[in-house]
């Protein structure tokens, strides 16, 4: 199920482009691709820049997404948003892996990986989960 994503490469702004046979994602691109491709969820509307190099722009986009999605408990397909201060600095997507909830994420330091919810919440101390209204 997720094996095709585990070999992807982290690239800021990556939305799943294939370069030399390897898909490239940043954290938002990976979350969107997994939601659409694995879970069949509709693409979320574009609200602007999402880049680790533009945290203010990303924060503005996050506020739009947070208003569009409901906050709630982790469920498959939910966006796991990492919050620092008033900024969303990172996202992952919740999946059921080996019968338990986990977050699939990517970042420059680790590449694509998955972590059980308790491990994700220990790594990132403030996490909010955002769900499609019909999940």
Set out the residue ranges of the language-model regions.
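Intrinsically disordered, low-complexity, charged/polar segments
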Residues: 116-135
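Short secondary-structure junctions
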Residues: 66-70, 124-127
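Structured surface interface patches that mediate subunit assembly and partner/cofactor docking
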Residues: 52-55, 101, 115, 119-122
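Residue-level preference for short coil/turn positions at secondary-structure junctions
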Residues: 75-76, 99
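Intrinsically disordered, low-complexity, compositionally biased regions/tails
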Residues: 17-20, 96, 115
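Catalytic Cys-His active-site segments of thiol-dependent hydrolases/isopeptidases
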Residues: 91-113
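N-terminal capping segments
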Residues: 1-69, 76, 82-85, 89-90, ...
